[in-house]
A protein has these predicted regions:
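Short pre-catalytic segments that frame enzyme active sites
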Residues: 67-78, 201-205, 230-234, 308-314, ...
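Residue-level preference for non-acidic, small/hydrophobic
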Residues: 66, 93, 136, 182, ...
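Extracytoplasmic/periplasmic proteins that interact with beta-lactams or build/remodel peptidoglycan
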Residues: 36, 48-58, 63, 127-135, ...
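N-terminal type II signal-anchor transmembrane helix
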Residues: 1-60
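Peptidoglycan glycan-strand catalytic modules in the bacterial/periplasmic cell-wall system
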Residues: 55-58, 62-257, 369, 458-462, ...
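Ligand-recognition elements built from short beta-strands and adjacent flexible loops
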Residues: 670-773, 777, 786-788
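Bacterial peptidoglycan biogenesis and beta-lactam-recognition machinery
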Residues: 95-108, 122-126, 173-179, 191-196, ...
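A penicillin-recognizing enzyme superfamily signal
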Residues: 316, 320-342, 349-351, 364-367, ...
């Protein structure tokens, strides 16, 4: 009775098999109904994806010289061509997984029927029937196509629709690819355990060799693992792995790929695997001190349309702009001044290469180690390239100076330097005993009562710049800070109350902005220096030199165009004004400690309560801004030598931050490249130049020209000394700062002739005589020295 039942089951199974094969291998036509439609959808072959798609691989992140510093992947796979795979591996696969591989057309009908009969008679699954083609399809849908857990389960579910689809696609695959191509794709795709995907990664993992170098026993072991990579792991189950290897060797001998004597000899050999599997560290977390740059590069690419998910799958080569020699110099400089183990305080440094069409980041470091262990002074927070700390302090005075230069001030313009400054409508608080509604600031040191803008940049009196920002306007200073490089100051909620820092500073008419009281992005601050070194031209800080895909094709990166942030002459003038900082300014001592003699432009900065400090410096070949700040859970004043948290701070930008810059600069080839040539126009100021420009003009033209530039003009007639009547001989401002609305007196010739040798004036010259303007050289000789 049981024999009859088995025979009946067999006949039914064969009938079902015939129907299934007919459905999956023949086009579905004329079979209406929802069920058939669903079956057709399930079976539909995505042949283009199978034959042209790329399996996930390993993305390599390198420094500018191509040396790897990190690998990014989900599946560690290295696709190799057929000739780079040992023939023994192909033979082992065919002899063990699909002996009729070269005879069938993707679906082995004989094997299918044989397995079906065996399983029915056994009352369970005793024999499989999947060909190499079918296994490839299943693994591809699981390892490549599946985008989530649900799709992964669908790719491996035990269901008739899934099996039919698999058979249909396997048949199509055989019509499209050669047998060798199918074997190559299969061996490049499947998992071999221990995080190795594909035969090349497997050969490296277990034997530290290439797939081309595998001998019969090694190939047999790897193919044997495919039965169950977990159960047959040779590191946890060497006996099981050895037994399975020997089964594969005997299969190879049975199919004639190797001699039986060779199979027996290899079967008696030890596994020969490495003492431990050779794996590959994954992610920026393994990049050590280069981790910050690696992480920034990935964020940068994500912003440009190449997300991390794609990078993890794409087998890209990402070449960064990081220069290892400059990076090492930066690390040494930072950690020589701020210990990685010091609680609550860190120093960050980015070194940016100036340029008018690109802005490469050559180094990005923190005094902290990159990592996850807080007990080991590690962090993965984006300290070098995000808004951190309590501000760059007086470094922000360069923005006020730049705004003043734009508005016509010159480096020689004289500015008041009161001991205490009280301004209204520009915030409140500040120095002690400040009246309600006023913002008060005092100078820490003793200064001359008046000094030039150039000297003010070097000596850094607070009161001078608070009064200067009152004259230039806070909005213009904020805007120029953003244009020069502090672009994150326009990010929504960067101020913390829903507003950007830039908007809050403008809304509150923040006089303290010139003293740098807000968190700063150290990368952007370094880029400000690079912008000034590059003729006032802003370019986005760039961590990427090149990206190619696994086929070596260039990947386009949509970078923003560079912008002219300020006039090149203003940038050069500001650089000239900042050059005195290391000569007789706040960075003089630091330059002396470093024995630094090359010209640079520099500005030190310290917040009012010494909670952070910075040093911005640049030459034509290097730009950087070391930044020291509280990075713990508690913000306190900071002390110097050594840098640490303390109750009463004494840290200044001319201390460790400046020391860091000079020490790092010795490792940067372009650091001694000098400064741009400065124009004399901005030494005196464009407003002063505007006054000089009307000398020699007639009264009406001169008056109109100055009024158009915002001056209030009055006229006085003076002794002509040979100038034609009605001709301007000088222009005298009432306010040496030449602010908007300044009263200017035009001194106009009365036509008197020059003094005769007897001391008597000569007869007046006719106003009808043609007056010839002096040459620029003669005009320069005739000018009186300016007190502005």
């Amino acid at each position: 009775m049981s024999a009859l039942r088995s025979l009946g089951n067999l006949l039914l199974a064969l009938l079902a098999a015939a129907l299934a094969v007919a459905l999956c291998l023949a086009p579905v036509a004329g079979l209406g109904g929802v069920a058939i439609a669903r079956a057709d959808e399930t079976m539909r072959s995505n042949l283009s994806d199978l034959t042209h798609g790329d399996a996930p691989g390993v993305t390599t992140v390198t420094d500018v010289h191509g040396t790897p510093m990190a690998w990014i992947f989900n599946q560690r796979r290295y696709e190799v061509p057929s000739e780079a795979i040992s023939q023994y591996a192909k033979d082992a696969l065919v002899s063990t997984e699909d002996r009729r591989f070269y005879d069938h057309e993707g679906v082995d009908m004989q094997g299918f029927a044989r397995a079906l009969v065996t399983n029915v008679l056994a009352g369970g699954v005793e024999q499989g029937a999947s060909t190499i083609n079918q296994q490839y399809v299943k693994n591809y849908l699981w390892l490549v196509d599946a985008q989530n857990e649900e799709q992964a389960q669908a790719a491996t579910e035990q269901s008739i629709p899934r099996k039919l689809r698999e058979m249909r696609m396997a048949s199509d695959l055989d019509k499209t690819l050669s047998k060798d191509e199918i074997l190559t794709r299969y061996l490049n795709l499947v998992s071999f355990g221990n995080h190795a995907f594909g035969i090349e990664a497997a050969a490296q993992t277990y034997y530290d060799k290439t797939a081309a170098e595998l001998n019969p026993a090694e190939a047999a072991l790897l193919v044997g693992l495919l039965q169950s990579v977990e159960a047959l792991n040779p590191y946890t189950n060497p006996d099981g792995a050895t037994h399975r290897r020997n089964v594969v060797l005997n299969n190879m001998a049975a199919e004639g790929y190797i001699a039986q004597t060779d199979a027996d000899r290899w079967a008696g050999a030890p596994l020969g695997i490495l003492e431990r599997p050779k794996t590959l560290p994954e992610g920026c977390i393994t990049a050590g001190d280069n981790g910050f740059m690696c992480d920034y590069a990935l964020h940068y690419l994500a912003d440009k349309g190449l997300p991390l998910e794609e990078i993890e799958r794409g087998a890209y080569t990402i070449t960064t702009t990081l220069d290892p020699a400059i990076q090492n110099a930066a690390i040494s400089a930072v950690r020589s001044n701020v210990s990685p183990e010091t609680a609550g305080v860190a120093e960050v440094l980015n070194i940016v290469k100036p340029g008018t069409d690109s802005r490469d980041i050559q180094a990005m470091v923190s005094s902290r180690y990159y990592g996850l262990d807080l007990d080991q002074s590690q962090t993965i927070l984006p300290q070098p390239y995000s808004l951190v700390g309590n501000g760059a302090g007086s470094v922000f005075k360069i923005f006020t100076a730049a705004a003043a230069l734009e508005q016509g001030y010159g480096l020689n313009t004289m500015l008041e330097t009161p001991t205490r400054s009280v301004v209204y409508g520009m915030g409140d608080g500040g120095a002690a005993n400040c009246p309600p509604g006023a913002y008060c600031v005092e100078n820490a040191g003793v200064y001359a009562p008046r000094m030039t803008l150039e000297d003010a940049l070097a000596q850094s009196p607070n009161t001078t710049f608070v009064e200067l920002i009152q004259q230039t306007g806070v909005a213009s200073v904020v805007d120029i800070a953003v244009r020069l490089g502090l672009r994150s100051y326009t990010d929504p909620d960067s101020f913390g109350d829903g507003r950007s820092i830039a908007q809050a500073a403008k809304d509150e008419n923040m006089g303290a902005f010139t003293l740098g009281p807000t968190a700063v992005n150290a990368l952007e601050l370094s880029n400000v220096a690079a912008t000034l070194a590059s003729g006032g031209r802003w370019c986005e800080p760039n961590p990427i030199a090149n990206v190619t895909d696994e086929h070596g094709r260039q990947v386009y990166i949509d970078r923003p165009a560079c912008e002219q942030a300020i006039d090149p002459q203003i940038a050069a003038a500001l650089a000239a004004g900042m050059s005195k900082d290391i000569i007789d300014g706040t960075a003089k001592d630091a330059a002396g400690r470093a024995n630094w003699t090359a010209p640079i432009a520099a500005k030190t900065g310290t917040t009012e309560s010494h909670q952070s400090s910075a040093f911005l410096g640049f030459s034509l070949g290097m730009a950087a801004a070391p930044y020291i700040f509280n990075d713990g859970t508690q913000t306190t004043p900071l002390c110097t030598r050594p840098v640490r948290q303390c109750a009463a701070g004494d840290l200044f930008g001319g201390n460790e931050a400046a020391d860091t810059w000079f020490r790092a600069a010795y490792g940067v080839p372009g650091s001694t490249a000098g400064l741009p040539e400065s124009s004399s126009v901005y030494q005196r100021g464009t407003k002063r130049a505007a006054l000089d420009a009307v000398i020699g003009l007639n009264q009406a033209t001169a008056k109109s020209q100055l009024e158009a530039q915002g001056f209030t003009v009055t006229v006085a007639t003076v002794f002509g000394n040979g100038a034609p009547a009605g001709t301007v001989v000088s222009a005298a401002p009432a306010d040496q700062n030449l602010s908007a609305g300044t009263l200017v007196t035009l001194n106009v010739s009365d036509g008197s002739g020059p003094i005769s040798p007897t001391g008597a004036p000569t007869a007046p010259l006719s106003p009808c005589l043609l007056y010839t303007s002096p040459s620029p050289r003669d005009r320069q000789k005739s000018r009186m020295p300016s007190s502005a």
